[in-house]
Amino acid sequence: EMQRSLVGSEMCIRDRYAKALGMNIKLLAECKHVDGTLYAGVAPVLLHAEHPLYSVNGVFNAVFVKGNMLGDAMFYGSGAGKLPTASAVVADIVAVVQNQGRDIMNFWSEEKLTLEDRSKTSKKFLVRILGNEDAFKERIGNDFGEVRFVEAGVNGEFGFVTPVMTEGEYEEKAKAYPEILHMIRVQEEV
């Protein structure tokens, strides 16, 4: 089953950290097929200003594709909000009615795909911790390696960005920190 994380009520605080990093938070659906392994997931992710999806806002959605022959391509347009959604639903209903009793080519297979365990995927992580940065600095450096501390002007907490590691490695290290308030993935590559 595909894992998902939803954007919660702490969005304002997360936005402050994103701004401090010169990044933007986007709800990102990812699907990657690398060396015979398939990964899919949905989660809020921090994107750099150079990423094509950085500036997608409002009722617009975008699909960013990295193809082996095509290279990078982005498809962009209305897709969120009540009018675009209603239009898509009506179009689907019309297509069903128009094709009643007909065989439509179906390219879907009955074979269930096995997805890569999310714990094996690699990213950087922005981690928010309750407390004072000075009290944790040495310990965090020892446990997580070379991190980038982030000052977002939020009272009583601080943040840091980890080096690239697997999600499983992050989860294991995070167990030693009950003070962790939140983690968000950082998308490094375009």
Regions from the language model: what does each represent?
Residues 17:
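Flexible loop/N-cap segments at domain edges
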Residues 11, 44-47, 164-165:
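Secondary-structure transition/turn motif
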Residues 26-29:
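Hydrophobic helix-and-loop "lid/oligomerization" segment in the mid-to-C-terminal part
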Residues 93-190:
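A conserved regulatory-domain signal marking ACT and ACT-like small-molecule sensing domains
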Residues 32:
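Short, Gly/Pro- and small/polar-rich lid/capping loops
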Residues 1-8, 12-13:
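Single conserved hydrophobic/aromatic residue that forms the stacking wall/gate
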Residues 39-130:
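Catalytic, metal-anchored helix/loop core of enzyme active sites in primary metabolism
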